[in-house]
């Protein structure tokens, strides 16, 4: 699937209109304010929000096994990125549990507007 198809499928599955999401992401990507990673039928948007920190948004159309593979790849790329911490809002607590099971230190966020934080070093 193309990234726009993945994001659209994820938004619709969650009862959200995909148009505003796609418009905002297009602007962020065009302005080089964010990067997009894709693995299988999952997309991760990484938006720098400060020195050494970024905000993450995950969109997926993968089944559980495909999502685990994608998360492994995304974690590997984040480990090599030089980021100290990443933040996000998880609508699905199962995804946070998957990330923890893959060895990432995930804690409650210390920044307003986010409900989780993962810190460096992202454990091997």
Model-derived regions: residue spans:
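Acyl-donor binding region in acyl/amide transferases
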Residues: 51-103, 110-112
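Long, contiguous secondary-structure blocks with strong helical propensity
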Residues: 2, 45, 82, 86, ...
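Conserved donor-binding loop and adjoining core beta-sheet/short helix segment
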Residues: 29-64, 121
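Short amphipathic alpha-helix that is part of the acyltransferase structural core
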Residues: 1-23
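A structural boundary/capping signal
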Residues: 1-8, 36-38, 90, 95-99, ...
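N-terminal low-complexity, intrinsically disordered segments
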Residues: 24-28
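C-terminal "cap" of GNAT-fold acetyltransferases
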Residues: 112-124
């Amino acid at each position: 699937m193309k990234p726009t198809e993945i994001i659209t499928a994820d938004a619709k599955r969650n009862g959200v209109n995909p148009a505003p999401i796609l418009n905002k992401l297009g602007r962020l990507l065009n302005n080089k304010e964010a990067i997009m990673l894709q693995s299988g039928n999952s997309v991760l948007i990484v938006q720098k929000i400060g020195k050494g920190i970024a905000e993450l948004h995950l969109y997926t159309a993968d089944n559980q096994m495909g999502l685990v593979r994608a998360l492994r790849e995304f974690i590997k790329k984040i480990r090599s990125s030089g980021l100290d911490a990443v933040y996000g809002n998880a609508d699905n607590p199962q995804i946070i549990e998957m990330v923890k099971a893959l060895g990432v230190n995930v804690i409650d966020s210390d920044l307003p507007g986010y409900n989780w934080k993962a810190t460096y070093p992202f454990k091997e």
